[in-house]
Amino acid sequence: MLSKNIIYFGPNIKGSTTEKRIKSLKELKYKVNIIDSCRYYQIRKSILKAIQIRAGFGPVYKETLTTVLKEINKFKPEYLIIEIGYLFNINSLNKIKEKYPQLKLIFLTVDSIKTRTFQKFFFLKTLSLYNFIVTTKSSDIEIYKKYRAKKIIFSYQGIDEKNFFDYALSINENHLKSEVVFIGDYGKDRANTIKFLIEANVPIKIFGFNWNRYKFFKTFYFGPAMADDYYKILNNTKIALGFLNKEVGDTYTTRSLEIPAAGALLIAEETEDHKKLFKENKEAVFFKNKNELLEKIRYYLLNNEKRKEIAKSGRNRMKQHDLTWKSNIKKIFFELENNTN
């Protein structure tokens, strides 16, 4: 009989997807002990620690390992889930495996292995030491195989049940309402496309981080989308845009799921994953270039009933997909518990 004990090593940040996964595990009756990775390293917070992370050794690794070993000894978990894998080098994982050979090591990430954060040779060499890799990026599977990952589990990103709620806005929340919205951090490609849309008089609002650095977007930028404001924004727009991170080869993102779940019309970049998730022009709308995007935005702003029809079908499709974090975690652990490694 499996114990239901899990140690979860990741960023314990309010509102994060990590928090949602941990909440889901607890709802599924797992006992979860959280080790907050932010205690050991946060990006852009410490130059000295950043140098250690780049090198793959130093006091931060000893401190992390000491805490993890202490918690394993105290908590006696069946699984150790690690999100921030670059805080463990080969020596760290080997020591854990030697001392606790029955413990299952899981590397779980919703980010691409191709991001700069993970493109560290010492970290990539640790992938073969994990019993399981859980990834939300199908395009990364071959990379994990290249580094001799033992067992790879693919899962779609998850969404929160709050995505399906309808939100009435107060007078003070009117800035959250929009015709067209984009939620996401500044990026060069998406900024160029949004600039093109603005110059074509598209009534767009932008929420996210780092847009305030650029004077051109000042009038259209409304700050980050925090806590429940995020759900309110998506539930009170006509059209929400789904841009992808081309640097890491994204083929869908969490927002690809959250936008239709919230009842907005998703207009996103055309990819195979998007077309697997939604029927084109019936549950979501896709575009190949900025001119096509502009054309489709204009069309669906003018054709209100057609837009509502597709948005409603997209929302129903998301309910059928059942891609809440709780559902996804349940599926992941079904695979974990039915695979010996």
Task: Kindly give the residue locations of the regions a language model identified.
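Nucleotide-sugar donor-binding catalytic core of glycosyltransferases
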Residues: 2-54, 59-67, 75, 84-91, ...
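Conserved acidic donor-binding segment of nucleotide-sugar-dependent glycosyltransferases
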Residues: 253, 284-290, 299-305
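C-terminal alpha-helical cap of glycosyltransferases
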Residues: 325-341
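A short, well-ordered alpha-helix in the C-terminal region of glycosyltransferases
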Residues: 306-320
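Short hydrophobic patches on amphipathic alpha-helices
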Residues: 72-73, 97, 127, 234, ...
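A short, histidine- and acid-enriched strand-loop-helix "catalytic/donor-clamping" loop
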Residues: 103-118
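Charged, glycine-enriched surface loops/patches
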Residues: 95-107, 129, 294
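N-terminal Rossmann-like NAD(P) cofactor-binding module of classical short-chain dehydrogenase/reductase
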Residues: 81
